[in-house]
Each structure stands twice: as C-alpha cells, then as structure tokens.
C-alpha cells in the first residue's frame, strides 16, 4: 500500500518549481524530473488532505494519451527511467509511477483550452453575452449542450493561487505570434476531437480540456505538462448526461460539493477533508483511469 505523497523531497536535484500538483526538478540543460504529488486543489486553493494514488493515476492517464496522440504532435516524454537519474533509495521511493523525466522546453504563456460542450465559465459567459471568449454562438443553447464545433478558447497563465484569465484569439496572437497561435489552435482542436471520440466509446464525455505546449530550441511545438486527465479536463459519465443540467464530473465534484456545504470562504487555508470525501474522490480518479485505458489501476 502506497503512502500518499503531499510534497516530494528530492535533495539530490534542485527544485525549480512547485505547482498545485507537480514538483519540478532540474536534471541538466535538456531534462527535468516531474513528480506528481497527491495534492488536491479546489477553487485555486491547495487543500491539506492528500488523495491516495492521485499523482500516479494522473501521470499514467497522461502517458496513455501522450502515446495515443503522438501522431498529431510530439510530446515532452523522453523514455528515461527516473530511477537512473535519482539514485538514493529513499528518494526513489517517492517516485514510482508518479514521476517522469521530460524534455526541458520553453512553455508558451497560454493555456490552450478546447470546449466541446457549454459548461462552467463558458456557460456563465454564454448566459450573459451569447458568446464564449468573444466567439458568438447560436441562441437557445442550454447548459451542458454540445457545441456545433469544438471551440479553441485560450487563457493566460496565472501564478499558483491566482485564476487563469480567458483571453481573445487576438490577444493570444499578440502573446505568441499569429502563426504559432493558429497552429496551437488547430492542433488543440485536433487533439480534442480524437480524444473525445475515443473517450465516448469508453462511456466518458470530455466536455472541455486544457492543453499546454512548449517549444524546443528549433521552434518545434511539443505537447507538455499533463494531458486529458480529470485535473485538466471536465469528464462526464455518458450514462448520466442530460442537456439542461450539469452532469457529475470525474474529478473534484465531491470535494467541491462538500466545500460548498461547509461555508468555507474559498481563501487559504483550505479545510481538511473527511475520510469519506477523500476516499470517494480517489475512487473517481481510479475509475477514470480504468474506463479510459481498459486496465485496472
């Protein structure tokens, strides 16, 4: 039985960044070590209760998609075993299936969001303006409706604890250049369409998702970070989907619902989760992995 990992401690390498979930260590000028912890954030606040096996599940779901979608765009995987980089047995014990050695690339300063259904902030904006990220949509759409075509709706990257901001396609082009913005939009929609069609066959609707990209020294585009996981996507069970209502998602829904019921003001520090809420959340992550891959975790 694995012990949940809240924070990694790899003293043999230099910690260069700690995100909401991942700890990133410097290996050399071409490689980094990513360690996906069992931290859980909700409402942009990291909660004090870890979710068992979450980091390993996220890493293995992302690896599954990286392999399945590599014909569309190259990715940051190297195939290098983390245990060949980290030699100390106590440090190796923190790695296992949660760790990856990846290419060191220059990340683009945008999140590449693709929406296939009207949900979350997109639904709120549609109600106010009949558009999403400034893109006009037909009248009369209901919550959770499938959009006529998947939409590329980028956002700016925020620091940990801040909210990402939706940006227009014009602003995206200003940030990364029009040619690259067009390529990112095209690749993102292609990734989404292929993944959504596959997932639907496994009983999961991918309502929306967030991709991240980086460039190598030659300017080639790579898919980086995590891909099509319950943390970066809104997964709905197909058998519970109904237009006009917000389906339960395969991620932090139990946690969000419980937090809403506590009256917590959504600012740090977050409250500790009851065992039942943490366990049901862990079950949902595991179910997403098993449904998508067809393998037991």
From Swiss-Prot:
One of its GO terms (biological process) is 'de novo' IMP biosynthetic process. Pathway: Purine metabolism; IMP biosynthesis via de novo pathway; 5-amino-1-(5-phospho-D-ribosyl)imidazole-4-carboxamide from 5-amino-1-(5-phospho-D-ribosyl)imidazole-4-carboxylate: step 1/2. The keyword Nucleotide-binding applies. It holds the Pfam family SAICAR_synt. Coiled coil: none annotated. Gene3D superfamilies: ATP-grasp fold, B domain (3.30.470.20), Phosphorylase Kinase, domain 1 (3.30.200.20). One of its GO terms (molecular function) is phosphoribosylaminoimidazolesuccinocarboxamide synthase activity. Its EC number is 6.3.2.6. InterPro entries: SAICAR_synt/ADE2_N, SAICAR_synth, SAICAR_synthetase_CS. Keywords: ATP-binding, Ligase, Nucleotide-binding, Purine biosynthesis. One of its GO terms (cellular component) is cytoplasm. Belongs to the SAICAR synthetase family. This is Phosphoribosylaminoimidazole-succinocarboxamide synthase. It comes from Methylobacillus flagellatus (strain ATCC 51484 / DSM 6875 / VKM B-1610 / KT). The gene is purC.
């Amino acid at each position: 039985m694995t012990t949940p990992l809240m924070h990694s401690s790899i003293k043999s390498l230099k910690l260069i960044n700690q995100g909401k979930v991942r700890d990133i260590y410097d290996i050399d000028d071409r490689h980094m070590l990513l360690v996906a912890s069992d931290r859980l954030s909700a409402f942009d606040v990291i909660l004090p209760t870890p979710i068992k096996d979450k980091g390993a599940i996220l890493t293995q779901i992302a690896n599954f998609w990286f392999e399945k979608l590599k014909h569309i765009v190259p990715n940051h995987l190297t195939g290098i075993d983390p245990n060949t980089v980290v030699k100390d047995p106590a440090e190796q014990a923190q790695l296992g299936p949660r760790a990856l050695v990846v290419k060191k690339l220059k990340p683009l300063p945008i999140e590449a969001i693709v929406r296939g259904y009207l949900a979350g902030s997109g639904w709120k904006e549609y109600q106010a303006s009949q558009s999403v990220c400034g893109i006009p949509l037909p009248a009369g759409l209901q919550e959770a409706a499938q959009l006529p075509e998947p939409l590329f709706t980028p956002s700016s990257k925020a620091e940990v604890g801040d909210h990402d901001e939706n940006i227009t396609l014009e602003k995206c082009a200003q940030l990364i250049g029009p040619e690259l913005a067009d390529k990112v939009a095209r690749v993102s929609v292609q990734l989404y369409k292929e993944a959504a069609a596959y997932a639907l066959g496994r009983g999961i609707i991918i309502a929306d998702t967030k991709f991240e990209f980086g460039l190598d020294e030659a300017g080639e585009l790579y898919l980086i970070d995590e891909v099509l996981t319950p943390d970066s996507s809104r997964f709905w069970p197909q058998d519970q989907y109904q237009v006009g209502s917000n389906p339960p998602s395969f991620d932090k829904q139990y946690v969000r619902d419980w937090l809403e019921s506590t009256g917590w003001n959504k600012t740090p520090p977050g409250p500790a989760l009851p065992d039942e809420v943490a366990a049901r959340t862990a079950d949902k992550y595991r179910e997403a992995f098993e449904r998508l891959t067809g393998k037991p975790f």
